[in-house]
């Protein structure tokens, strides 16, 4: 969410106990995140679903919730911040998005946390910068029922 971190960082998570600060944790099985408003060149201001994810137990990042993405995606710099590095065993793969443009990636397994739920998940570590942070389905959505409430402008993760 390069260039949009400011707006997203102003969001707070809400649990069933009410709104909490940006570093607070949900204490039960339900976590809500308000959508963020961003400018679209086609549609003006649009509301997009995001979630606060902790990567490798230390790095807090807002990610777009993308139910159409098979796998979570992070840019090169975020991978470096959480201590990822390429090894000889890593295979350089390519993933394709809208318009069939490809992105070079390496699949890595990392520790993630959403609310109080901690888990390991595979993610696609992009070898370029110009990609959004996407929270994809593989190894993440199996822990939660994910509901995008368009009218209420919130994303709800229930366990």
Task: Label each residue range with its predicted role.
Residues 1-159:
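Pepsin/retropepsin-fold aspartyl endopeptidases
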